[in-house]
Amino acid sequence: MIRSILFPTDFSAVANSAFPLAVAIAAQFEATVHSIHISDGGDPHITETSRYEFPASPTGASAVRVIQQIIPKGDNDPAQVIMRDAEARGCDLIVMASHGRSDVGQFFLGRSVAEQVARDSKIPTIIARLYGPRRTTRPIDRFQRIVYATDLAESSKQILPLAASIAQRTKAKLEALCVFDEGDEEPADGGRATLERFFAEAGASELFGKIRRLHGGVGEAVVEHAGRHNADLVAMTTALCSSGNEGITDTAEFILRNAPCPVLCIRP
């Protein structure tokens, strides 16, 4: 259940472009969107009048409650400020773009910050890459197909309840994508029994259906699959294909940087 969503913005067009996604999800769950800007005290252009630069609610979304606030960065790392603020507000989800202003003095939603939030946040986070040659190409305010990427590890099921909840609310198709890295042994049943249990534990047995399987070169394969099948969201943990190692994996990082749609992830 999503009751509160954090949307960080640096007021740039790119950062604000992720706002419709936050609002679209909030509308489905009757959730509140907390739209925040992290102000650098050294920037004379950031004042209380800057709240007028916050993105306006999309047409038809006026019923969604949006709270706007400017908070000081101080000497803190922007990613840490975002994660700490999300926890303090009791947010269930963070939605942000992966690029904002490139000016050093005003830039805080760059790839490094977005990836740090995705890598370290215990709160589920949706990252939409909205800048560059491999930017998000699908509409980000609607859901018809959600891809749940799993390596069958117990940790990989942690993102499934939220992905399933979004699919249930939006009536999107939730597709299970079972991935096997080079050298991984595939179960005799292809992972069906494990996935059936994952979906049952997530309260989403009715969404479980056909399983797709990918072998080797997992990051590239997931990105290619998401593009070919017009996925609107990829859901995964940052430990995808980790083999027990801690931290974000190269596979998860590649998907986060190259997926043709927003990526929903969590640190397990």
Give the predicted meaning of each segment.
Residues 83-135, 224-268:
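Gly/Ser-rich helix-loop-strand patches that form or flank binding pockets
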Residues 1-52, 60-63, 141-190, 199-210, ...:
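Small/aliphatic-rich secondary-structure junction motif
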Residues 22, 78-82, 163, 222:
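Generic hydrophobic alpha-helical segments
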Residues 12, 40, 75, 101-102, ...:
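Residue-level marker for beta-strand->alpha-helix junctions and adjacent short loops that shape enzyme
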Residues 45-46, 106-107, 137-138, 159, ...:
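Short, well-ordered secondary-structure micro-motifs
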Residues 196-199, 217-227:
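A short, acidic, amphipathic alpha-helical segment used as a generic capping/interface helix at domain edges
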Residues 70-79, 213-221:
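Charged docking surfaces used in two-component/phosphorelay signaling
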Residues 132-144:
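Intrinsically disordered, low-complexity Ser/Thr-rich linker and spacer segments
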